[in-house]
Structure formats: C-alpha cells, structure tokens
Amino acid sequence: DAVVDGKPVTGREGYQVEVNALWYNAVRYALELARKSKDTAFVERWEPMPERIRKSFLELFWYEREEFLADYVDEHGQNTFIRPNQIIACSLPYGMLGEGMKRSVIDTVRRHLLTPKGLRTLSPRNPLYEGRCVGDQPTRDRAYHQGTVWPWLLEHYVKACFDMHGKAFLPEARDMLKNFEEDISVSGI
C-alpha cells in the first residue's frame, strides 16, 4: 500500500480485522467441503477451530466501549480508528458476531463512513482524516487511506445490511444504485 518517506501511511501491523474474518470463513468453508466429501480426518482435526477462532476474534477485536470492531490489534492493543474493514466481518457468509454486535457495527459504519458513492477509509471525526485526495504524490498517498471514499466497499455494506434487514433494505439499496446512474451513463462500467 501507500508508503511516504519509507513509512506506511497506515501501518496496520499485528492482527487485521478483515484478515481474521476471512480466515474464519476459510476454515468454516473448508469444513463444509470436508463434510460433503466425507473427509472425517480433516473434520475431526479442524472441527474445534471455528469456535476457538470466533472466541479469540471477539476478545481481540470487539471494542466494548463504543461497540464496534477494532481495525487491528498489535502489541499496543486495539486500534480503534473507525475504518471500513470491520464491515467485511459482517458481510461474509460465516459470521462471528451476534445480531446485536453486527447491528452496532453496521450502524457505526453508516454514521461515520457511508457516503452516496462508497465508504470512507477513515471517520471524519478522526484527527488524521483527509477529506480530499489532491496534491503531489506523497500528499495523495497520505490521503489514500485516511478518508478517501472507495465504492467497492459498498458491496460489503449492502451484503451486511441485506443479511441484517432482508428485503426491507431494498429501497435503500436502490437509492444507493441511483447515486451511480450518471457515473455509469457518462463513464460506463
């Protein structure tokens, strides 16, 4: 990712929330395939892992005070900057969060990161927030993960919301799509 003066713009050393959510999903999917193919040795070895992963995930990433997921955890503890990576943990087929936790993450993302064109990479309330990606290359690189809006993250937000709200979310999803009509007609896909 972006590096300025030899240092990462957004250092995320340690355990990242989305990587751990993807790992949990990979293990759960592998177990599903192993059961279907009757690979009992694999199932016996890996069956206890999802619950252990889920428990560790919640202990590491759940930020109890504000009720959302930390972006990453390192030797200094939780990084509680509000970033969009936590929505990935809510959008994957195998979830680790209870309904209340998931609702809280979605609400946090909606309040702090959702825009008509995507999710911000950092909450505007954060002092490191850069609302515009302009200037020379180092300046743009600094802004890249510090507030820039990424449309591709809407997929995860929409999946999480449909999972939480079902068809009741459809009108909001349609409104989100309408926000891209001009972009699609002018620039294409």
Predicted regions and their residues:
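Non-catalytic C-terminal accessory modules of carbohydrate-active enzymes
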Residues: 107-117, 121-132, 138-149, 155-189
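Solvent-exposed loop and edge beta-strand segments that line ligand/cofactor-binding
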Residues: 4-21, 70-97, 135-153, 163
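A structural signal for alpha-helical segments
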Residues: 11, 18, 38-48, 77, ...
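Short amphipathic alpha-helical face segments that pack within enzyme cores
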Residues: 22-25, 29, 152, 156-159
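Catalytic cores of carbohydrate-active enzymes
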Residues: 24-133, 182-189
